Amino acid sequence: MNVYDFDGTIYYPDCVLSFGMWCAIKHPRLWFTFLPKAFFYLTLYILGIMPRYRFERKGFGFLGMVDDLDEQLEKFWDKHEKRISKWYLAQKKPDDLIISASPECIIAPIAKRLGVSYVATEYDREYGVLLNNLMYAKEKARYIFDRGFPVINEFYSDSLSDTPIALCAEKAFYVTHRAQKVSDWPELDRKTLDRVHSKIDTGTDIHLD
């Protein structure tokens, strides 16, 4: 089994951001009802006031403001499916697993089109809450552990935050250049490990508040 992060790895740039902009164009009221709040949350996150998991949850908030969400998701992927990296399509296998911090409702349609399995963040768009921890950093490795540690032949990601699950794979690859260049995973020297530790910090081990 090969495992892939999604955003920045086999899709560029970020499906939540891309779909959020798509929805704002289709439903212009979001420019006034959601985007000002989104920029406020971003400021709090950059200043270190809001932890990563809460920033992500707040960023998913627009999903509950779009009445025709499922229809818009299909139309979005009709147009954006072409952004899936060609290098991935050339090596795609039926037992691939996409593992992503993005919400399930966004990842599910494209995973179905690709014919592969997926696991993503469980988010209740009606109530605006996470139903489980954000599928990010250590949570990806925890998911693998909880499934009996299946063999991961190859793992691909664009982020050092995925180092915990990269260490679970027989071989890990680092994706850069707008999801176009694939290289070996960086050596985990002290400087790199310091970066890893800062990236995997979500603020708390429980993401449900």
What spans do the regions from the language model cover?
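Metal-dependent phosphoesterase signature
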Residues: 51-86
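C-terminal cap/substrate-recognition subdomain and adjoining C-terminal extension
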Residues: 76-209
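Generic secondary-structure transition motif, activating predominantly at the C-termini of alpha-helices
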Residues: 24, 39-47, 63-67, 77-81, ...
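Short, compositionally biased "basic patch" segments
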Residues: 34-62, 111-114
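Active-site neighborhood of HAD-like aspartate-dependent phosphohydrolases
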Residues: 1-48
